[in-house]
Amino acid sequence: MPFSNSHNTLKLRFPAEDEFPDLSAHNNHMAKVLTPELYAELRAKSTPSGFTLDDVIQTGVDNPGHPYIMTVGCVAGDEESYDVFKELFDPIIEDRHGGYKPSDEHKTDLNPDNLQGGDDLDPNYVLSSRVRTGRSIRGFCLPPHCSRGERRAIEKLAVEALSSLDGDLAGRYYALKSMTEAEQQQLIDDHFLFDKPVSPLLLASGMARDWPDARGIWHNDNKTFLVWINEEDHLRVISMQKGGNMKEVFTRFCNGLTQIETLFKSKNYEFMWNPHLGYILTCPSNLGTGLRAGVHIKLPHLGKHEKFPEVLKRLRLQKRGTGGVDTAAVGGVFDVSNADRLGFSEVELVQMVVDGVKLLIEMEQRLEQGQAIDDLVPAQK
């Protein structure tokens, strides 16, 4: 769990090699980058709010790896973490985001009119479509490091801003601590609410402290636009609906997100952003757009095909189990989404998903007929 600086000072009584974590069995990005020399160089540093190197890496020390996805193994505790510990974060970001260099600049495009097609993904295969991102409010620590007071202030600010949304975005806020166990579980099962904080990544990084204090979900009346408050990020903004109309989902996402940003600005708050990293979020895997456009897609044949992982890789897509990051696929249904977050715009990422999903459906249909798919295997995007 996050420590104060007095604890860090105490640790400096021991030589760096005595404090260096045992990463010999680890398979995450942090463990690939962190050497005893780098640890020695950075361990005495801290951000203005007191976040230290050990706070950054703890989740990756406690969680050696993941069977489906190469985890990042570190978190930021505030906006300054990415700068103070850049010797660690920069190579991790480059590794995780396909060679994204410290000198590269990120691009943003939240104009849904720039998306080609996407309103006709076959609903016989695509069960639901979803676009999400995260946003952090400048001036507050991020969830691994924020205090109870900060968390409550973020909740208050967010609820005030969201209550100003109108039209088809109008809705209400449900605080986690005022929900019954059954209500909570129903929302989780329907994929509307974040899981209880059982994920070891959440626990080891300190994001689950004081749970469920100041956590909750805001959603519009027909549950197609949702905002999670104070889970892994200050805000997670989600647009979702049944079926394959990704264009509609993305349009609602862009409109809602733009309105939320305007509402925060009217209260003199802005989102953490810089030209190099785009939108700043807790996990380095979400930097840039923070955007994950995904579909729940039925691929009973392709899902078992030996070429499936390679096809996804070439399309710059990734698969998760039906229930999310820590789960397996049920009944041939996969959660397929863009693998990238940084170095591509929002529109480009959603376009990759739309185009890729169409090809996956074509392959599935071929396999249903007992035909080969070799000629459909794409080149690397």
UniProtKB/Swiss-Prot annotation:
Residue list for modification Phosphoserine = S4, S199
The region called Internal MTS-like signal is annotated at: 130-138
The reactions it catalyses are:
creatine + ATP = N-phosphocreatine + ADP + H(+)
Instruction: Give every Phosphagen kinase N-terminal domain span.
Output: 11-98
- PTM comment text: Ubiquitinated by the ECS(ASB9) complex, leading to its degradation by the proteasome.
- One CC-aspect GO term: extracellular space
Q: Which domain of life is it from?
A: Eukaryota
Q: Which PANTHER family match?
A: ARGININE OR CREATINE KINASE (PTHR11547), CREATINE KINASE B-TYPE (PTHR11547:SF23)
Protein name, entry field: Creatine kinase B-type
